């Protein structure tokens, strides 16, 4: 075997250095662009040839070996029979180890003018170079072809001829660099041991990113074929010109070495056998190059040609073999509620090319591009992290007492907290009973009691009480005023209970800001400027939705500006909420935290007054100077 051929086998000559094994930043952990090891793709696979010496019967063949002065030695002759191991010269002999079995070869049938050798692969592979070592004189003309569709179509890699112009009508790359034909490997000398070497990463491909589309088109193969088109004789001079040579008309090849690697787009450094593929039993098959990638960089597929199921937030890319950039696939943001996602180019473009992942088949009663909200009929349980499988709980609204939301035919609760929209006069978290002062729970809600006090919620009969106060005066006509820049609260069916709406049953002591020592002595957890948005009767308690406009004090609590809920003392205990909190108005509120639940409590110990800038300044001064 020639020196360059041995170098190609051992180190890959310049091909590997310029190509796949020269990937920037290659490491065993495949942190950057990486490629599986290279090897002989013919090893462990079946090589095909049109004919084989002695395939039908024993044949006689002869060959010359020349001296240095080109005079022919005495020809040597032998027999071949494909059915007898010691006389066989099968195509598989071209794929065995060139070092362990250097004197084995394939030989065609006698007097064959055209011959074909073909390697069929079970998957797509990267092909880098071919080394052929001839026992017979090299052909006067031959073609190297490849297929990328398992033999359906073929494209030429290289033409070989003693005269490219005369044989194929092509220019010779010995004269014109980069031409598709060459005369370099078509000389009949030497009569035996002549090499043919083809490098797939020759110019102009040797400077490209080895995973670019251009290089893939050049290197990717599923089949490789060599067509031997024209024999030529050994050029040595016979001493006896009258002695006609016999049995020299055949092709014979020692080695057919197809160097390449598993094709993984730069996303794997190891490969395993393709499912269902069985290697040919031959010595050294444990060194064979397998065809299914063990993908890294969050990629998947036999060739890491697409992103893993939950990593489609950006377009898939091959790694960059020049810079070493792995171009990893990025995970979709599905909040733990989906196993797969897909890339949507419209979503990608709408995001400014930042995120294009759309979660598939959201689980755990969630929906949305990122499974980011509960489905209609479910609400967000704030006690659980949203990634928890039970973060969305089913609404439990009473079918009679709950109102149907606009544009829906089914009753749904507030998806943020599970509150049900109740019909007029209906109370309770699930809208399952009448409010105090109402009766006749039914399809149209509950009716007001025709009493000065409360009435029986079922019959409507008045219930007398010594605490009842005359209700026969008119209620003030109060309507909450919303700032046009602020969105109005949507749950209008749940009305707020306050002394203003139920003044006949409620007496709240007017609060004044006394001395600073008394104010500081209350040790309030929070002091806020708020605007009342709405109040909601929950049957056992009232929730007041507010907008925090300014935080004057907060201790261990993390309180921010924006919407929040306050929890006044239960109106079921007092008949109203005290201190008075009327929707649409602004207040200064100082109160305590329920250490068990973390709720902001408003009760008779709280300080509540209508907001005035002067009041705010005075309280801030007390907090800074006195409350230490």
Swiss-Prot record:
Laminin EGF-like domain residues: 262-331, 332-394, 395-448
Species: Pongo abelii (Sumatran orangutan)
Domain Laminin N-terminal: start-end pairs: 30-261
UniProt keyword list: Disulfide bond, Extracellular matrix, Glycoprotein, Laminin EGF-like domain, Repeat, Secreted, Signal
Official protein name in the record: Netrin-4
Protein location: Secreted, Extracellular space, Extracellular matrix
Single GO biological process annotation from the record: basement membrane assembly
Entry GO terms, CC: extracellular region; laminin complex
Record note on quaternary structure: May form a homodimer.
Signal peptide range in chain numbering: 1-18
Described purpose of this protein according to its UniProt entry: May play an important role in neural, kidney and vascular development.
Record: glycosylation sites: 56, 163, 353, 483
């Amino acid at each position: 075997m020639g020196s360059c051929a041995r170098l190609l086998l051992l180190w890959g000559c310049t091909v590997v250095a310029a190509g796949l094994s020269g990937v920037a930043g290659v490491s065993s952990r495949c942190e950057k662009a990486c490629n599986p090891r290279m090897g002989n793709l013919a090893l462990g696979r079946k090589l095909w040839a049109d004919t084989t010496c002695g395939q039908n019967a024993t044949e006689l063949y002869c060959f010359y070996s020349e001296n240095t002065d080109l005079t022919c030695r005495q020809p040597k002759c032998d027999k071949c029979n494909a059915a007898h191991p010691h006389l066989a010269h099968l195509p598989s002999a071209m794929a065995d180890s060139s070092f362990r079995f250097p004197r084995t070869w394939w030989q065609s049938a006698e007097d064959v003018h055209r011959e074909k050798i073909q390697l069929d692969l079970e998957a797509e592979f990267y092909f880098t170079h071919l080394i052929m070592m001839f026992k017979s004189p090299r052909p006067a003309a031959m073609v190297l072809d490849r297929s990328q569709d398992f033999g359906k179509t073929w494209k030429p890699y290289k033409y070989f001829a003693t005269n490219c112009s005369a044989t194929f009508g092509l220019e010779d790359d010995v004269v014109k660099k980069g031409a598709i034909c060459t005369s370099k490997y078509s000389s009949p000398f030497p009569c035996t041991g002549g090499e043919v070497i083809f490098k797939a990463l020759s110019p102009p491909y040797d400077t490209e990113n080895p995973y670019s589309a251009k290089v893939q088109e050049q290197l990717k193969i599923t089949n490789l074929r060599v067509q031997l088109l024209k024999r030529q004789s050994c050029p040595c001079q016979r001493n006896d010109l009258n002695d006609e040579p016999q049995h020299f008309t055949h092709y014979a090849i020692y080695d057919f070495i197809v160097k390449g690697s598993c094709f993984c787009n730069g996303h794997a450094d190891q490969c395993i056998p393709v499912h269902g593929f069985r290697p040919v039993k031959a010595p050294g098959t444990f060194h064979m190059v397998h065809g299914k990638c063990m993908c890294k960089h969050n990629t998947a597929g036999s060739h890491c040609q697409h992103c893993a199921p939950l990593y489609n937030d950006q377009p898939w890319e091959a790694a960059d073999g020049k810079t070493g950039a792995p171009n990893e696939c990025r995970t979709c943001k599905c909040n733990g509620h989906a196993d797969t996602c897909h890339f949507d180019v419209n979503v990608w473009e709408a995001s400014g090319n930042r995120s294009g992942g759309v979660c598939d088949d959201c689980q755990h009663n969630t929906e949305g591009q990122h499974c980011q909200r509960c489905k209609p009929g479910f609400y967000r349980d704030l006690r659980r992290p949203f990634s928890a499988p039970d973060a969305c709980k089913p609404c439990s609204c009473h079918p009679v007492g709950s109102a149907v939301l606009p544009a829906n035919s089914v009753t749904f609760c507030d998806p943020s907290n599970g509150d049900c929209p109740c019909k007029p006069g209906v109370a309770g978290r699930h809208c399952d009973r009448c409010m105090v002062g109402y009766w006749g729970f039914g399809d149209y809600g509950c009716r007001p009691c025709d009493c000065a006090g409360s009435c029986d919620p079922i019959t409507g009969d008045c219930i007398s009480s010594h605490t009842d106060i005359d209700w026969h005066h008119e209620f003030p006509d109060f309507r909450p005023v919303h700032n046009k820049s602020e969105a109005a609260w949507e749950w209008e069916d749940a009305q707020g209970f306050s002394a203003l709406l139920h003044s006949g049953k409620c007496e709240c002591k007017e609060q004044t800001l006394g001395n600073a020592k008394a104010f500081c002595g209350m040790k309030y957890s929070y002091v806020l400027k708020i605007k009342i948005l709405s109040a909601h009767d929950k049957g056992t308690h009232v929730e007041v939705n507010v907008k925090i406009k300014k935080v004057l004090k907060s201790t261990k609590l993390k309180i921010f500006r924006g919407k929040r809920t306050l929890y006044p003392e239960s109106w079921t205990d007092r008949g109203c909420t005290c201190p008075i909190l009327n929707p649409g108005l602004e207040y200064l509120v100082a109160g305590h935290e329920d250490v068990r639940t973390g709720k902001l409590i408003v009760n008779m110990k709280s300080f509540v007054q209508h907001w005035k800038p002067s009041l705010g300044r005075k309280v801030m001064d007390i907090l800074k100077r006195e409350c230490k």
